[in-house]
Regions:
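Conserved pre-ATP/AMP-binding loop-to-beta segment of ANL
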Residues: 9, 24-26, 150, 159-180, ...
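AMP-binding/adenylate-forming catalytic domain of the ANL superfamily
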Residues: 140, 493-514, 533-539
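Structural core segment of the AMP-binding/adenylate-forming
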Residues: 15-17, 57-58, 85-156, 475-477
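AMP-binding/adenylate-forming catalytic core of the ANL superfamily
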Residues: 97, 114-118, 266, 383, ...
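Conserved beta-loop-beta connector loops within the AMP-binding
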Residues: 356-380, 414-415, 477-481, 516
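Gly/Ser/Thr-rich phosphate-binding loop
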Residues: 237, 263-268, 277-345, 358, ...
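Conserved AMP-binding/adenylation subdomain of ANL enzymes
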Residues: 199-216, 224-264, 279
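Conserved AMP-binding/adenylate-forming core of the ANL superfamily
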Residues: 28-73, 77-81, 98-103, 153-156
Length: 539
């Protein structure tokens, strides 16, 4: 028996139309250093139409890739809608990649046009001669640029087009946007999101983050990474004011923007949110308008969640996902009826799977194991916004029986709460036992003198691998390896306790704020660290 329901396309065009028609007075607000620029959804929608017309005039047709190399601002939002709604593919370029990788992904995606901020033009100029597919460069901003040949001014090209555009029919399974993984363990790999996946993911973000038209959403998450976690699309769809910090991502700039525009919700990686917390504690900045923040990208220390609650009065939610999952897959809400004193048990977990996504854990043989909170294995995921392959790259080892292999190791309990204990490549295998680098890092950051920490496995003649702990101390604080190991001792098994310690000014991070453990291992192998070695503990 067939249903009687209508079959409407699930496309970004429909999200765009809805936000434009229902919430014309909601605003895009871009911080410009001292003051913010306010533009209504209705006015932005006209500019979206003009941009689509300009790209069509330049010869862009459905399926063509149009890249952006931009900060978070109104013009980037315009590209977020104009490019996919006209049938082309939005390719957001990671502005923190080294030039060699930037050129590699532009060439791999075969971008025909690049929209670039004037402040980022030197980065593009450093690779443009290597990018044969790029035919036109459109520059946002009025700053002088050089090294890019003949360029087009963003405002000039959109001013030449009418404020209306006839959007073509869209196949909901066609590519809408693409993002490349950060490539910490190999070359970056492209993930192409469909209109259908973005549409469905937007509803998941709306429900999971509880967005609506009474709220103001501060998008700190870079728009070059995984569609800024889908927040621009979800926020536009439900009429949330969208607050964009531009290039002003240092704590002082963020605080100034927050104090001026009073957002109610935000999100970011632990590095950014920790820096914001420290700034407020030392300068007294006012972030009281924010009621909720979501944190992801790497494990969120329980101490950070508690500090946001106790110091800032902000409820901090931990979320988990990856480029391949669009990215939202889990969110760490306590179950209904949890006593306040027990909430941290759940808030500090990786989270419970969001509706629409399935998770399982498998052993080394690929066999699913019980969700009992004890059995450990690799986490696999599937769902309508989870990738089934990579763009023009064969990677069969990443896919298993219709599931995406995440490379994360952990367990799932009977209530569906996930606890990631490590990346499969980062698990420390010592004398036949597994040691979780993530758990050691989280515990170390709980020490009052520690600002940041990383743990990696290094060669050991007796045990094959042992943990090396890298520690960043807070300004003015002091701690010794013995003190830190004593702090860990009651919290973990004895064989987990590191013998090798080094203190550093900062930890290497990837372009999206994750620990770069590949670089840490390389630097250790080249003896770049001054390592203190303690006497081994007895097993």
């Amino acid at each position: 028996m067939n249903s009687t329901m209508q079959d409407s396309p699930l496309s970004i065009t429909e999200l765009f139309r809805h936000g434009t028609n229902v919430f014309p007075d909601s605003e895009i607000i871009t911080f410009e250093g001292e003051q913010a620029r306010h533009t209504s959804f209705a006015k932005v929608a006209e500019r979206v139409n003009r941009l689509a017309g300009a790209l069509r005039t330049l010869g862009i047709v459905p399926g063509d890739r149009v890249a952006t190399l931009c900060w978070n601002h109104q013009e980037h939002i315009e590209a977020y809608f104009a490019i996919p709604c006209m049938g082309a593919v939005l390719h957001t370029l990671n502005l923190r990649l080294p030039p060699s990788q930037l050129a590699q992904i532009i060439n791999h995606a075969q971008d025909r046009v690049v929209i670039v901020d004037d402040s980022l033009a030197p980065l593009l100029a450093s690779v443009i001669d290597q990018c044969a597919s790029v035919e036109k460069v459109i520059v946002v901003g009025s700053g002088a640029v050089s090294g890019l040949g003949e360029t087009l001014a963003y405002e000039t090209v959109i001013a030449a087009e009418p404020p209306t555009f006839e959007w073509p029919p869209i196949d909901e399974r066609s590519a809408a946007s693409m993002c490349y993984t950060t490539g910490t363990t190999g070359d970056p790999k492209g993930v192409a999101y469909s209109h259908r996946s973005v549409y469905l993911h937007s509803f998941a973000v709306w429900g999971t983050f509880r967005l609506d038209d009474t709220g103001r959403l501060l998008i700190i998450v870079p728009m070059f990474h995984v569609n800024a976690w889908g927040t621009p699309y979800a926020g536009w769809m439900v009429g949330s004011d969208l607050l964009l910090p531009g290039r002003f991502l240092q704590p002082q700039g963020l605080c100034d923007f927050i104090q001026q525009e009073r957002p109610t919700f935000t999100g970011g990686v632990p590095t950014i949110l920790t820096a914001l917390l420290n700034h407020v504690q030392t300068t007294g900045g006012d972030v009281s308008s924010i009621k909720t923040a979501v944190c992801g990208g790497s494990a969120v220390p329980a101490t950070l969640i508690a500090a946001y609650r106790d110091v800032l009065g902000i409820e901090l939610w931990q979320a988990w996902g990856m480029t391949e999952t669009s990215p939202i897959a889990t969110i760490a809400f306590p179950p209904k009826g949890t006593a306040p004193e027990d909430e941290m048990i759940y808030r500090s977990k990786t989270g419970r799977v969001v509706p629409g996504v399935e998770l399982r854990i498998v052993d080394d043989a690929g066999v699913a194991v019980p969700h009992d909170g004890e059995a450990v294995g690799e986490i696999e995921v599937r769902g309508p916004w989870v990738t089934a392959s990579y763009y023009n790259i064969e990677a069969p080892e990443k896919f298993h029986d219709g599931w995406l292999r995440t490379g994360d190791v952990g367990n799932i309990d009977a209530r569906g709460y996930v606890q990631i204990t490590d990346r499969s490549k980062d698990v420390i295998k010592s004398g036949g036992e597994w040691i979780s680098s993530v758990e050691l890092e989280t515990l170390l950051v709980g020490h009052p003198a520690v600002a940041d920490a990383a743990v990696v496995g290094v060669h050991d003649d007796r045990w094959a691998e042992r943990p090396l702990a890298l520690v960043v101390l807070k300004p003015g604080a002091s701690a010794t390896p013995d003190e830190l190991r004593e702090f860990l001792a009651p919290k973990v098994a004895r064989w987990w306790l590191p013998e090798r310690w080094t203190f550093v000014d900062e930890l290497p991070k990837t372009s999206v704020g994750k620990l770069d453990k590949k670089l840490i291992r390389s630097d250790y192998g080249q003896a770049k660290y001054s390592v203190v070695e303690l006497e081994a503990t007895k097993r």
